[in-house]
Design a protein with these regions (language model features):
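Hot-dog-fold acyl-thioester-processing enzymes
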Residues: 1-56, 60, 119-125
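Short, well-ordered turn and helix-capping elements at secondary-structure junctions
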Residues: 25, 67, 81-83
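A structural detector for beta-sheet-dominated domains
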Residues: 10, 66, 113-115
Length: 125
């Protein structure tokens, strides 16, 4: 891993996704709008599966939501390494999500612990 490494995923949420999420959390959401936690879940996916990947421990996330996303709208979420702290086995990442027109939907930062990430994938290894 090095500063500048990134991972990205694109996703469209359907009204069925919103209904399933509403059932899971016990709260009704406007069916045409994607709830913010579903957008944030894209970052969790990227961090746990792609970069740094399996073994990553999510410590902190700060996200600023700049606009709403409607069902059926394509979004692209991205995480990018902004700082490595190999002495503490920590990685700082920037997090962004854009809509199909390239407009910024969210911006934020994440902090993850990578001590349990397989050797060879850790910073400085």
């Amino acid at each position: 891993m090095k500063v500048g490494d990134h991972a990205e995923v694109s996703r469209t949420f359907s009204t069925a996704d919103i209904q399933d999420y509403s059932t899971l959390c016990g709260h009704e959401f406007e069916q045409s709008r994607v709830p913010e936690p579903l957008i944030g879940a894209l970052f969790s996916y990227l961090l746990g599966v792609c970069l740094p990947g399996e073994g990553t421990m999510y410590l902190k996330q700060a996200t600023r939501y700049l606009q709403t996303v409607t069902c059926g709208e394509l979004m692209s979420a991205r995480v990018e390494i902004s700082r490595l702290r190999p002495d503490k086995e920590l990685v700082d990442l920037s997090t962004t999500c854009r809509d199909a027109n390239g407009r910024l939907v969210t911006t934020g930062r994440a902090l993850v612990y990578v001590g349990d990430v397989p050797r060879g994938m850790q910073p400085g290894v």
